[in-house]
Amino acid sequence: MTSRAVANLCSRGKDVIEMKKSFGRFARYPVSIFSFAEGTRFTEAKHMSQDSPYEKLLRPKSGGIGLTLSTMPYIKKVLDFTIKYDSNDRTFWDFLCGRMSNVKIQVKIINVPENLVQKNYAEDEKFREELKEWLYSIWEEKNRFLNNKF
């Protein structure tokens, strides 16, 4: 289950306790959870409508990752991937199919800050704000990487 699916569960009024039960099995087995915090494909129209401060990124959305961290407090690190294409005309699918010759991938291991561990995303406004600030700082680094020349 993706963190986006978790956010959808919560937005439909599902109880966080139910999510914790569902995620309980993840504590016993190795799993990978993918969160696409941008939430959607980048287009110039979406970029302009969001008034994004990042030149090549949409604003990050914190709901999915916030609920995941809330229900899985044993997550202490995240792998952050940033993929830089040599052309704005190509898609992620083109990348997966090997249709691009010049791609840079930045992979970073990021520690989840202590102030974001064992918090309740649904009820703790301070946690939501701190999580947004953390994501924004990660996005600043992504933006710098994407703006560097090939």
Q: Residue locations for each model-derived region?
A:
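Generic hydrophobic, helix-prone segments enriched in Leu/Val/Ile
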Residues: 19, 75, 95-96, 135, ...
